[in-house]
């Protein structure tokens, strides 16, 4: 019975691994896009504010401060 389950377990493992790799690649692309575009961050603040909050916290934890404040300042001046 163990020999029969081995190919199935291998297929499941490969599927889970592929899903993880797609997820990591997607998260990296999203981070890169948010990091390079203030306009995209503004779009994210309107549609997905919780994702933008994770972005701000991650860059603040890495030692980059002031991005949130610069964004808020620009968005406030663009409204006026």
UniProtKB/Swiss-Prot annotation:
The keyword RNA-binding does not apply. One of its GO terms (cellular component) is mitochondrial membrane. It comes from the Eukaryota. Keywords: Membrane, Mitochondrion, Transmembrane, Transmembrane helix. The chain crosses the membrane at residues 15-31. Signal peptide: none annotated. It is found in: Mitochondrion membrane. This is Protein CEBPZOS. The gene is Cebpzos.
């Amino acid at each position: 019975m163990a020999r029969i389950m081995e190919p199935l377990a291998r297929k499941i493992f490969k599927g889970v691994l592929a899903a993880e790799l797609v997820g990591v690649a997607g998260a990296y692309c999203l981070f890169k896009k948010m990091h390079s575009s203030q306009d995209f961050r503004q779009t994210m603040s309107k549609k997905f504010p919780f994702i933008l909050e994770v972005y701000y916290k991650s860059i603040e934890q890495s030692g980059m401060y002031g991005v949130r404040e610069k964004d808020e300042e620009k968005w406030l001046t663009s409204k006026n």
